[in-house]
């Protein structure tokens, strides 16, 4: 799981630090330290992945000129030398240095986007300079961010202290009349704001990436978790600790010792109450697997046996419910771990959903039509869509939801709604997860707002309590986790207040951070902004307004009047008619989509639609692609839908794409529209959550806009789903249904007007808890039938376990009765499996790919070839490092097709990657023209060197993978224990070898055929694991030295002890085998000599 580490320090001259030295170290660069007239060189330091030096938008001209035309490290060098020169005091504070852990769950590109977002909103927005670097250490990606402590003035730097400005815009004065000052940057309050801002942005980007994770930056104490916080050990402390371990001594560091004490205390607390681990996990994730439990335990538990014991104890905890059993991914054959949640989490969300439904059915908080009309007159520029949304939230229900994209007019709508509520006598307040969002709600909509955490704290202290005259607006509701959302819904229920949730459709994904908002919005319905403008016909826009207001019957009447509703007697006939019309209307220049509510309908419609295109020759049979739901065939021209977020490809759940190139388990598709149109390359081994996209579920279509839509109505639809399905189109919509089934249920209008779809129940389980668990699973995108089956299987397993307990109890009772002489217990003998003499190594510190990746960097041939490549870069480009980064070498390594395209681009347009060395034209000097000539001559050579490097890298990778897999297979072999008879023979053989009586040794070994076979099997295992003659050398006389260290590499302490004990036995075995080989060779040689003597010689 991601680590919540965010620390700050001040780079102070008084503590012997220099901001230029710090910058050079972080940028892994060579810099001139002008104050001391010396050069600092950290170019040998590794781990730098990305670097940026960024100025605020209103930065003065002098600082822009200072860093102009410099590299990132060059800009950093120039700026911080300027700071060093400006600060005159011997104890001057030069900069603030932030160290921030990045989440492993996000890719490097996603982490860079996260940091840029944070820097823009919380550093540059305050006028600070941001100098940051991304260090990609294995398992510990992090950034170092240095910021200024003084504002930038027109000529240089401003004062570190600034006057405190009051609400009237004037400086605040003390009682004596003096102006009150505060630090411009670097104070504790400033740090707290930055820390809160970081965790808010972090959780936002985790949610956008589809990561089921929420990071809480508060201390364990404030979170209510009974654990001691561990201490962050810096680079120096960790280096000392490693060196001490290499020498076999304990590191004498106070921080290390204190950290170990806290880890031991936490281990004790977890042993006493393993449920603490569940508290930790469920604060970050609502659905988890065994790996999540292991990640938490690894922080505190080192002993393997204790670790395994606690793993079992936690997973079998009565509070844990298994939602999905361990399965195999059909498309890849990979193991998918079992998924779990806690009963408390499921009950919490179920209670929240019930309370939200209850609030939606309670009336009495509405605004009169008169007040609404007065508001609309004052805001004449409100769109019909915004008016419909205002009517929705100002309705009588005590809960409402609004979904709209950023910039869609939500704030304008909320401002007008606030005025309407205030006219009706209500008090309107607001809240948001982030302080920035709360501030925006207050400034732009005029709604008194705080952060959600601030509201919770004030209510806890009995201040600013809600009442039946309060309207509470929650902005960015999609980012609020289930537990916090449940608390606010419960508060609204108890206080008699009304709560309005405002969110973004991009946050309506089945992830923890947005699951609460989605769960509520799905149940109570919502108004959607940026919907009505989709439709081009006026009557369609009016119908969409009716749908938004819940007047489904009026909307259906409009579509029926314009011959857009087709009813057939049976549903199957309606499907046939839909496909026929779709085939007739299909136009590759238009976007067309079929919508249905049920997944089985979607699958059927996709198959039928594609068959029509194949018949017409518009797409071919296609190439096989193993998707997560089974095999599909894709060809150029196919329409597809992506079913899972993937940040590295820029894909969103429900996004529509069109295939342009198809091959087995690989496609190239276009996504987006207009200027946003782009191509993505999808490899099955990396991403397989896609399907044909001619038809998709209504839920997947949320937020989508297409030209034409065909809707298959089913009895499972309700008012909210109908609203979504019938507002996705621009040009045309056609609805199809089976008249017979709908007539049995009151007709089309009645079914499609229902406030809530009928809940799914299972014939084999009617308990309330199971229904809640299924709803919980469905909200998070888990397959409901799979979850249901898992719960039933687990119920059966529980019954069988109880039976086993009863059987065990009966046996114990029988044993007790036998002890009293009541009956005689039959005697049984069990055979215990013999432990191996030396156990094989079954677990490894890293995966094969990790080990291969590490070794690639040390391969001599690759290093030499890369030196050639880097030298060519220096010949060709004016700034080789920047050009190298622009080439996107990671993509070049990952995909051969991408590599081919990049290298072709390099050869054809080298200037598109970076400025070439030298210059041309009449103003260029002779050396500059010569440098340009050399650069152009070296472009083809650079391409050849890169191609050679890629070929060599692929060859070396395959060799290293084979070597590592062979090594792992070899060291995993168990050396079997010898039977008592074999041990006796072994001792006799050993004595004979010591007496140098090898014939006697062989005689002892051959004395018993079964024993000889056992010893041969033992020798075979030793040979396969350690090598044929490894233990025959003089270096193998004793289990010590380099040979012993080599053979025991990767072993646990107990395995090393086993090896020491087995060493003389294995050495004796190899000596015996060696002597047998010698005797056999001599025998063969003698037989050959005799044969040669007996061969007759023919005389001529």
UniProtKB/Swiss-Prot annotation:
Binding site for ATP: 404-411
Keyword terms, alphabetized: ATP-binding, Conjugation, Nucleotide-binding, Plasmid
Pfam families (alphabetical): AAA_30, Bep_C_terminal, MobA_MobL, Viral_helicase1
InterPro entries: (+)RNA_virus_helicase_core_dom, Bep_BID, Coronavir_polyprotein_1ab, MobA_MobL, P-loop_NTPase, TraA_Ti
Signal peptide residues on this chain, from the entry's feature table: none
GO molecular function: ATP binding; DNA helicase activity
PANTHER family: DNA HELICASE B, DNA2/NAM7 HELICASE FAMILY MEMBER
Family to which this protein belongs: Belongs to the MobA/MobL family.
Protein name: Conjugal transfer protein TraA
Source organism of this protein record: Rhizobium radiobacter (Agrobacterium tumefaciens)
Record gene name: traA
